[in-house]
């Protein structure tokens, strides 16, 4: 099974137990002990939405149970900028530069992204980014 990098949008649905397709897929991947990775921008985005410090600690513990695909400094930031430019050159705008950074890490790690954020679909149209299919 390929490596999957769940975006913060998928983790947020998961922590809310929302029943959203990305929540259900993440539950399945966790139950199947799929190869999941996490990256610093996802940790930051998820923890920023914590309701309290104790909630942040619980979420952090859950997230960091998975291997960390670290951001490789300037290289990944430059790749993220190139991703945003490629999308813009293709006539589409990526709303979040953070999503470009997450995509840069996923591409480098050959990981597919599980998400509920349209930016990743746009990025995948203009780069080598793979999207993890829901219900896979």
Model-derived segments and their meaning:
Residues 1, 32-36, 65-67, 107-112:
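Short active-site oxyanion
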Residues 1-38, 48-61:
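Short, well-structured N-terminal submotif of metal-dependent ribonuclease cores
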Residues 6, 38, 71, 114-115:
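Short beta-strand scaffold positions
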